[in-house]
């Protein structure tokens, strides 16, 4: 069996090189993931995305841009987004004895964060972000840590649904 699936590749710098352009033209390339090393300014990011789409309109432009410590673009008009754990912490904060208010506020905040994250990326030409993280935080992984909403799967799934 010979399965050929498209790859998402990366580039080194702020602009496309001749080698990058050749790789992006390859039919087995499905998209590109951007990192902090590809960021200089909002104008530069917008130009880079336009250059990528000029090569092939069907290429997906992705980024791991979650908020908190995993936010690739942090200046020049990008909002500093909270770590997902902050949204999870809102879940249990019922104000003035109103049961369920914390859940509602957490879901509303997750929806607002998701909208803002997507709008800012889309305005520059980025197609999607690899967020949210759906890992459960049992306190055993510093890699996951505050990137996770919570340790409760129900809470994680509802907040993730709200964010998306």
Q: Where in the sequence are the language-model features?
A:
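N-proximal short alpha-helices
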Residues: 5, 18, 129-132
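Enzymes and membrane/adaptor proteins characterized by extended Gly/Ser/Thr/Asp/Glu-rich
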Residues: 28-156
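Boundary/entry segment of secreted carbohydrate-active catalytic domains
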Residues: 1-16
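Metal-dependent enolase-superfamily TIM-barrel catalytic cores that perform enediolate-based chemistry
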Residues: 158-162
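N-terminal glycine-rich anion-binding loops that anchor highly charged ligand groups
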Residues: 15-29, 33
